[in-house]
């Protein structure tokens, strides 16, 4: 059954407020919240220095991540799923919940959701899962309920390997994934505070309402803000590799709600869970979580633990603190019941195998492959961050480049250039992978020095070589490395002859002058002298041999 999108149709939010519609703007009257009361409560100051026998606390952290699937249309209707359009342009009776309309599941959403479940190594990918209605009243939810999966999510019992920051012990830790389920997004509210005698209000944009999401719920396996940021970054990396989502935090296509509680070290029972929302970068996520851990720990140490309540708090970037938004609903408050207008989602093993066959190599496998090449951990992390960079590096290796040389130049000088270049990416820069392979091989084989490499690389990067490759440029400019011992010895003799005072000081015990002579030899050769050979000859000459 097809449903034509009705441009400009906006449904009243079935909530405690009544929106008034003006064109495509939906104006929602401001409702009373705990934000004013909460903002008046400053976070408690840190307790005095800990006593020797004071109880130590640890944080217990789990994350609910909402990932927008980058399908062309919404989850259950044909409205376009695009970011940044005119407010309420992409709405229709289906996504606004008008009576008599029926949702139809987007097949592209299912395929990408299953790919993500496989990527998360879910041991359970249900061949039959069901949809439910999650009911709550808020102006951003025009239907008064959200189609989700509750009793039977499509994916469960997964895991994600996360590179843990050195400050938290380093290494790779496996973070459990409780479940992954398909649901639809809510609309977006933009709040405007009161001014003078004018009351505050909110504008509702329902373009986002009905956009397809996968919600990924982690186990409470994280302990610090840095770990939370590392988990979020790894999950974003995965969804980008799979082309499930662009994972753009600032645009809301990936949103992380972090559940934080603290407990005495060694205790099994969890503390009171507080949800922290509205963090639009991983750095902000780390700071928000660390603040919330400190807030809860301080309250408990000061005998005010009963002030920690199950609630939703927002991160206030300007004040660098979490602020209470509202009491956190429980499962009973959502009144889940089976979605009557959607049949179960059913697929067979052949469908799952087909999705798996189309999946690319994932970050964890690439890390293992690069580690086997002997690449250092920091270079591996830089390379794996960008799928396009991985493809370029692999093409460079396939063209014959020594792996370590290629990784060094890519993650160093080339990435520095791309960071500062305007409208240039690894995929569009003029330096072809085969030319980088030739460049790296020439340095590895001693045909040119690293210094000469740095001199010619900028021309290769910006394409000012007339299409000539590295070897042709070196030959044209006479930059080949000097590896003839006799020629280098003559250069060294000339340098020593021109600097008798420094030579006398060196032989008198001023060893630091060695660098002076190395620089002079390098300059005299135009940067072409073989570094190892010239150093060997120089040391013999300095010793008077």
Swiss-Prot record:
It is found in: Mitochondrion; Plastid, Chloroplast. Keywords: ATP-binding, Chloroplast, Ligase, Mitochondrion, Nucleotide-binding, Plastid, Protein biosynthesis. Its EC number is 6.3.5.-. The keyword Thylakoid does not apply. GO terms for cellular component: chloroplast; glutamyl-tRNA(Gln) amidotransferase complex; mitochondrion. It catalyses: L-glutamyl-tRNA(Gln) + L-glutamine + ATP + H2O = L-glutaminyl-tRNA(Gln) + L-glutamate + ADP + phosphate + H(+). Its main location: mitochondrion. It is an enzyme of class 6 (ligase). One of its GO terms (biological process) is mitochondrial translation. Subunit of the heterotrimeric GatCAB amidotransferase (AdT) complex, composed of A, B and C subunits. Belongs to the GatB/GatE family. GatB subfamily. PANTHER family: GLUTAMYL-TRNA GLN AMIDOTRANSFERASE SUBUNIT B MITOCHONDRIAL AND PROKARYOTIC PET112-RELATED, GLUTAMYL-TRNA(GLN) AMIDOTRANSFERASE SUBUNIT B, MITOCHONDRIAL. This protein may be expected to contain an N-terminal transit peptide but none has been predicted. This is Glutamyl-tRNA(Gln) amidotransferase subunit B-1, chloroplastic/mitochondrial. It comes from Micromonas pusilla (strain CCMP1545).
């Amino acid at each position: 059954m097809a449903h034509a999108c009705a441009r400009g149709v906006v449904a009243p939010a079935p909530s405690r407020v009544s929106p008034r519609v003006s064109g495509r703007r939906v104006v929602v009257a401001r409702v009373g919240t705990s934000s004013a009361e909460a903002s008046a409560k400053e976070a408690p100051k840190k307790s005095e220095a800990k006593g020797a026998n004071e109880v130590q606390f640890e944080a217990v952290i789990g994350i609910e991540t909402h990932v927008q699937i980058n399908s062309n249309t919404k989850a259950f209707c044909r409205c376009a799923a695009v970011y940044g359009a005119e407010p309420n342009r992409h709405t229709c009776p289906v996504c606004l919940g008008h009576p008599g309309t029926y949702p139809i599941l987007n097949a592209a959403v299912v395929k990408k959701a299953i790919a993500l479940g496989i990527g998360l190594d879910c041991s359970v990918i249900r061949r039959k899962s069901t949809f439910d209605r999650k009911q709550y009243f808020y102006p951003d939810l025009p239907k008064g309920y959200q189609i989700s999966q509750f009793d039977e999510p499509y994916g469960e019992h997964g895991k994600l390997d996360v590179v843990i920051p050195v400050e938290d012990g380093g290494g790779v830790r496996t973070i459990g994934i409780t479940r992954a389920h398909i649901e639809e997004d809510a609309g977006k509210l933009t709040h405007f505070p009161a001014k003078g005698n004018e009351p505050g209000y909110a504008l509702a944009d329902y373009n986002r309402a009905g956009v397809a999401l996968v919600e990924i719920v982690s186990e409470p396996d994280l302990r610090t803000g840095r770990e939370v940021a590392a988990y979020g970054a790894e999950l974003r990396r995965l969804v980008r590799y799979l082309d499930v989502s662009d994972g753009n935090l600032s645009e809301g296509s990936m949103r992380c709600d972090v559940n934080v509680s603290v407990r005495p070290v060694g205790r099994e029972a969890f503390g009171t869970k507080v949800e922290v929302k509205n963090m639009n970068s991983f750095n902000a996520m780390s700071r928000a979580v660390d603040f919330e851990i400190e807030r809860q720990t301080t309250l408990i140490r000061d005998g005010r633990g009963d002030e920690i309540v199950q609630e939703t708090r927002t991160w206030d970037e300007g004040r660098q603190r979490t602020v209470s938004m509202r009491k956190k609903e429980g499962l009973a408050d959502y009144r889940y019941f089976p979605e009557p207008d959607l049949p179960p989602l059913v697929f067979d093993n052949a469908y799952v195998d087909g999705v798996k066959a189309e999946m690319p190599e994932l970050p964890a496998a690439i890390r293992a492959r690069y580690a086997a090449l002997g690449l250092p951990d920091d270079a591996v992390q830089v390379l794996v961050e960008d799928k396009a960079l991985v493809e370029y590096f692999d093409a460079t290796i396939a063209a014959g480049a020594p792996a370590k040389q290629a990784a060094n130049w890519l993650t160093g000088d080339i990435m520095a250039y791309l960071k500062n270049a305007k409208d240039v990416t690894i995929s569009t820069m003029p330096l072809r992978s085969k030319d980088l392979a030739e460049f790296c091989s020439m340095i590895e084989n001693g045909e040119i020095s690293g210094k000469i490499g740095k001199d010619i690389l900028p021309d290769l990067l910006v394409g000012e070589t007339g299409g000539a490759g590295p070897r042709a440029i070196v030959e044209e400019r006479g930059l080949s490395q000097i590896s003839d011992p006799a020629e280098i010895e003559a250069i060294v003799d000339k340098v020593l002859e021109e600097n008798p005072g420094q030579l006398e000081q060196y032989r008198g015990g001023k060893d630091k002058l060695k660098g002076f002579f190395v620089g002079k030899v390098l300059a005299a050769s135009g940067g072409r002298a073989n570094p190892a050979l010239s150093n060997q000859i120089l040391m013999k000459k300095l010793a008077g041999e």
